């Protein structure tokens, strides 16, 4: 019975480490694969903020969020002028 418990614990540990590695890797990038609901919501990466933009609110670095929002405004203005 203890052999079964050891295998279960080992598998659970591997899955948990994989999830932690995914979060750590995505914190280095400008954009996260994590989506959020509201701009005040916290992201799992301390370097990312919840950014509201055209497609869907997404966690990203603050500077990238500012660039994305400026780009969306410019595209919207060009579309309205046509």
Curated annotation (Swiss-Prot):
Expressed by the venom duct. Residues 1-25 form the signal peptide. It comes from the Eukaryota. The modification 4-carboxyglutamate is found at residues 30, 34, 37, 40-41. Contains 4 disulfide bonds. GO terms for cellular component: extracellular region. Residues 77-82 form a propeptide. Keywords: Amidation, Cleavage on pair of basic residues, Disulfide bond, Gamma-carboxyglutamic acid, Secreted, Signal, Toxin. The modification Asparagine amide is found at residue 72. It is found in: Secreted. Its main location: secreted. The keyword Transmembrane does not apply. GO terms for molecular function: toxin activity. The cysteine framework is XII (C-C-C-C-CC-C-C). Belongs to the conotoxin I2 superfamily. This is Conotoxin Gla-TxX.
């Amino acid at each position: 019975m203890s052999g079964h418990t050891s295998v279960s614990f080992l598998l659970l540990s591997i899955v948990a480490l994989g999830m932690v590695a995914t979060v750590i890797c995505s914190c280095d990038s400008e954009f996260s694969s994590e989506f959020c609901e509201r701009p005040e919501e916290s992201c799992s990466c301390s370097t990312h903020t919840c950014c509201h933009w055209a497609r869907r609110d997404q966690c990203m670095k603050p500077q990238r969020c500012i660039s994305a929002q400026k780009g969306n405004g410019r595209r919207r203005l060009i579309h309205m002028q046509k």
